[in-house]
């Protein structure tokens, strides 16, 4: 199995690659973790990971700048139904639009917009930086065996914007930061996380292992 982590100039690429290699090794999964900017290698991969940090518009421009990458993603994820994971802004790009400073079109895979977080508690600072628990809204194999909820493990977040999904069924999990904030989305063969599994220690490694084993 070959897992393509897309290098388009954004994301914690080294830590993501290392986390996927470690999760595969510790779970006894035979997987080649391929950090690549080659659209053809993405198109032929068994699983695809789209990381991302920074501004939505910058990440979209970076993705568009890689020849054939958006086309490869649409073909491989939507038509060939290969398992896909978006991380942080990589998840946000799954949406229809980003509303950060300007309106930027996303990939349009998950109905909804990415908008600025406005916590109900004014003492909560933006961006949300640090550890927070996640609460699963819809059961999904990606969370199998992972303690969640009030007594669960913590995930690591760094973000100022959130995906406001139009369909509640697409929201797999939330976190509480002055109100519910989308922590994970999923539909068909695609999932995305606002938190960083590559930085989320035990929860993150278990999550990555579940993604590698997932058969949508």
UniProtKB/Swiss-Prot annotation:
Give GO cellular component annotations, separated by semicolons: cytoplasm
Q: State the pathway, as annotated in the record.
A: Amino-acid biosynthesis; L-histidine biosynthesis; L-histidine from 5-phospho-alpha-D-ribose 1-diphosphate: step 5/9
What is catalysed by this protein? 5-[(5-phospho-1-deoxy-D-ribulos-1-ylimino)methylamino]-1-(5-phospho-beta-D-ribosyl)imidazole-4-carboxamide + L-glutamine = D-erythro-1-(imidazol-4-yl)glycerol 3-phosphate + 5-amino-1-(5-phospho-beta-D-ribosyl)imidazole-4-carboxamide + L-glutamate + H(+); L-glutamine + H2O = L-glutamate + NH4(+)
The active site of this protein is located at: 88 (nucleophile), 196, 198
Q: Which InterPro entries match?
A: Class_I_gatase-like, GATASE, Imidazole-glycPsynth_HisH
Task: List its EC numbers.
Answer: 4.3.2.10, 3.5.1.2
Q: Where in the cell is it found?
A: Cytoplasm
Which Cys pairs does UniProt list as disulfide-bonded? Answer: none
Sorted alphabetically, the keyword list is: Amino-acid biosynthesis, Cytoplasm, Glutamine amidotransferase, Histidine biosynthesis, Hydrolase, Lyase
Q: Which Gene3D superfamilies match?
A: 3.40.50.880
Q: Name one GO biological process term.
A: L-histidine biosynthetic process
PROSITE patterns with a match to the protein in the record: GATASE_TYPE_1 (PS51273)
Glutamine amidotransferase type-1 domain location is 2-216
- In which domain of life is the source organism classified? Bacteria
Name the NCBIfam families on file: IMP_synth_hisH
What is the purpose of this protein?
IGPS catalyzes the conversion of PRFAR and glutamine to IGP, AICAR and glutamate. The HisH subunit catalyzes the hydrolysis of glutamine to glutamate and ammonia as part of the synthesis of IGP and AICAR. The resulting ammonia molecule is channeled to the active site of HisF.
Q: How does it assemble?
A: Heterodimer of HisH and HisF.
What this protein is called in its record is Imidazole glycerol phosphate synthase subunit HisH
Q: Report the gene name.
A: hisH
């Amino acid at each position: 199995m070959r897992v393509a982590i897309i290098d388009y100039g954004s994301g914690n690429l080294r830590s993501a690659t290392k986390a996927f290699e470690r999760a595969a090794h510790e779970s006894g999964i035979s997987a080649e973790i391929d950090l690549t900017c080659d659209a053809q290698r993405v198109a032929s991969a068994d699983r695809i990971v789209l990381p991302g940090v920074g501004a939505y518009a910058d990440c979209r421009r970076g993705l568009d700048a890689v020849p054939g990458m958006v086309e490869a993603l649409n073909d491989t994820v939507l038509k060939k139904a290969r398992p896909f994971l978006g991380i942080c802004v990589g998840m946000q790009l799954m949406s229809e639009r980003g509303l950060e400073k300007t309106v930027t079109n996303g990939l349009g895979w998950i109905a909804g917009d990415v908008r600025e977080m406005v916590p109900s508690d004014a003492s909560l600072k933006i961006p949300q930086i640090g550890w927070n628990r996640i609460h699963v809204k819809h059961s999904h194999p990606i969370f199998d065996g992972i303690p969640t909820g009030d007594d669960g493990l913590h995930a690591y977040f760094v973000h100022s914007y959130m995906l406001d999904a139009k369909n509640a069924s697409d929201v797999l999990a939330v976190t509480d930061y002055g109100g519910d904030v989308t922590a994970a989305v999923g539909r068909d063969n695609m999932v995305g996380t606002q938190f960083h599994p590559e930085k989320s220690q035990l929860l993150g490694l278990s999550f990555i292992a579940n993604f590698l084993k997932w058969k949508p």
